[in-house]
Amino acid sequence: MSLISKLRELAEVKPDHEAFVFTEYDTRSGDRTSTLTWRQVYVRASNLARYLNSLNDDLERQKFAAICAPQGIEYIVGFLGALFAGWCPVPLPEPQGGLQDKRTGLALLDCSAAVVLTTAKDEDAVRATLAAYSLAVTTPVIALDTFEVADVSPSGAGDVSDFRPPEGGMYLQYTSGSTGNPRGARISLENVEINFRQIAKAAFPYKGTEVSLPRSTVSWLPLYHDMGLMVGLFIPVYCACPSYFMSPAAFVRKPIRWMRMLAERDQPFTAAPNFAFDLATSRISDADMSGIDLAHVSAISNGGERVQPNTVDSFLERFSRYGLRPEVVKPSYGMAEAVVYVAISEVGTPPVSTEFDAQSLANGHAELKGPDAEHATRLVRYHKLDADPLVRIVDPESCVELSPGGIGEIWVHGGNLSSGYHNVDNALNKEKFHATIRDKSPGTPRSPWLRTGDLGFEWDGGFYIVGRSKDLIIQDGVNHYPDDIENTVKEFTRGRVAAFSIADERSERLVIVAEVKPTGPASGSSGVELPLVKKRAMAALSRLHGLHVADFLFVPPQALPKTTSGKISRSACAKRYLSAGFEQLEVPQ
């Protein structure tokens, strides 16, 4: 059943049941909850759809409706209202200043938004963004929180049966832009339905041979992010269960809110990127967890950035005493071009990680850590390559499928894949989304394959991820993965780190930029610790990775540019470094 049909069914058979419940913390009047029932969602989206269709009678051209609103129920209404109108929703962040606004402006420019859906408090900021990117000053900007039913004319508002939106539809999901400017992947509602089925089969627990769907979802992920949209909107609709959500800032300020919300809800499913698990482990105290039981949690997906085995271990060790079962935590892999999901750890088993010889990985081939290996790299295992969607490891140059252990590009084949990027040359879309394997294994489709740009290898029936091909650092002919370098440095700096290379006329120069707190034992507050931290980190990079560091900078917290999904943007870091844009902390000599 399509997303639209499912919404209509829920509005008719569960009209007064909770659908979307948003909790806003720390308001002047305390914590505040906003709720929409299934009928209210359908009627409000229908009213907005009528109004959108009254703005323009041009049915020949695909119309894009950008949603630039804060986290909340208005975002849900805006996204669904655009779909109901037959328009193409474009989920984007609200204007907040800085690099994120640049990405929003570039996306608005790229899709030529015919309308922008926001809230009253952000209306002026949205108009300023439109003006900054020379977009039409006549572009309608609609404040969803003050939009009245009376605005719908002449049809007016009515019951569920009064409005039948088109069944098909698509939206533009802009990539996070971790290695360049964001691009809008065209995602159809058929892609979404297929991806939901793939997630349900792979991530949710089983009762016998039947999938046991979650009875609620819990999320703090932004709704403009692919994973946030899946957990906060799509899964609740397909599972006919309520969505409980908060803002990302509410979680970061007090991570315990995530655990409390999970404990309060019925068999919840949730997801978050790796850093959130670190944050929860380090910032939630035993006193915070008093009375909290996590035994009923359906599944917790760790995805959106590279999953660190140490993070998974620490999270399970920390919260297993509160009933969290190991098999519930699911390392996952995905991307916007695949709706969100590509692979996950095996069903019904705890997360698995394996130690590989670091030098072998640097040389382009995986080998298990031997007894004499000086340094090992521990990687998380993902499910078998023949699961749905299919995954293959392919030589990016020859397009030949590699044998187990060979490090190559991860290619994906399945019905959840985007048809291509919006407003991009057909040749590039063909190369990216319709790749062909020249020498393939039996049973492997020749095409079409999505080239992910990620590097990995097959091992013992599953596969492992080692990094992004665009981020690869090559020094003295040896490949180095920035995630491994950053993890080594973090052991000493205890903060976020970016490792990237700058090319000169002879070679690639490795640059490290590390965030440190202005006070504390590793921060240099006494004027002594920073030089020692730097010395130890550089010695470890030399000893464990055989790397020479050309420059090592300390910067304040939050100085490293991030993508819209919260990942460090190494390409933006490199640009800022070259323009001397980092505010460095002084390191006494």
UniProtKB/Swiss-Prot annotation:
This protein's UniProt keywords: ATP-binding, Fatty acid metabolism, Ligase, Lipid metabolism, Nucleotide-binding
Superkingdom, natural source: Bacteria
Residues spanning the signal sequence: none
Function: Catalyzes the activation of long-chain fatty acids as acyl-adenylates (acyl-AMP), which are then transferred to a multifunctional polyketide synthase (PKS) for further chain extension.
Organism of derivation: Mycobacterium marinum (strain ATCC BAA-535 / M)
PANTHER family per UniProt: DISCO-INTERACTING PROTEIN 2, DISCO-INTERACTING PROTEIN 2 DIP2 -RELATED
Pathway: Lipid metabolism; fatty acid biosynthesis
EC number: 6.2.1.-
One CC-aspect GO term: plasma membrane
GO terms assigned for molecular function: adenylyltransferase activity; ATP binding; ligase activity
Stored SUPFAM superfamilies: Acetyl-CoA synthetase-like
Name of the protein: Probable long-chain-fatty-acid--AMP ligase FadD30
